[in-house]
Amino acid sequence: HLRPGGREFLSSLCEMGFPGSLADSLNERVHWDEEESGVLSDTGWRYERFPVCHTPETDPHGYELIHETGFRLLHCGDSGPCEEIEKRASSADVVILEMGMPDIGEFPHHHRPSDVISFEERHPEVKILVTHNYSSGKGNESGFPIPNLPNSIHQLEDGDTLEIDRNGNFIMIGKS
């Protein structure tokens, strides 16, 4: 699954990096899907790609994933606060926000801790997971310290798991 025009773009990058060696594999072994929305085979999931707020050169988009149980996951991509995220958040069960900058200035293309807290206050019924975190992970003393966010907001670490059952109920399991 990739953006419209992505097959041509990725194929040309592969040709530049590995001339003549990947074309057959890309044509014969890869199933390309460049649709903006659709169904993920026999998984019970469908998706919709939507625009978010980041530098246009990065083709900024997020994905709304909807399970046949009604469970909705909103992955906002690399983005700052924006109307499209706000519009979709009210119907989501879980929202994944990137938090790429600390509260040291204005950064319209990234969420800061204050933006994430404000989002949580507007959408208290939604489980918020933070990724693309500017801060260091737990137990790492270098870099920016982990910001103090409300307990309702989970700052993802490598190894964390979101388990969704057959009824659309979910639990967040932190790494050991």
What name fits each language-model region?
Residues 101-104:
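A short, flexible beta-alpha/helix-coil linker loop
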Residues 92:
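An anion/phosphate-binding loop that grips the pyrophosphate of nucleotide cofactors and donors
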Residues 1-74, 80-82, 87, 121-127, ...:
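Binuclear metal-dependent hydrolase catalytic cores
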Residues 106-110, 140-141:
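Short, solvent-exposed loop/turn segments at secondary-structure boundaries
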Residues 95-98, 115:
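Metal-dependent phosphoesterases centered on the DNase I-like endonuclease/exonuclease/phosphatase
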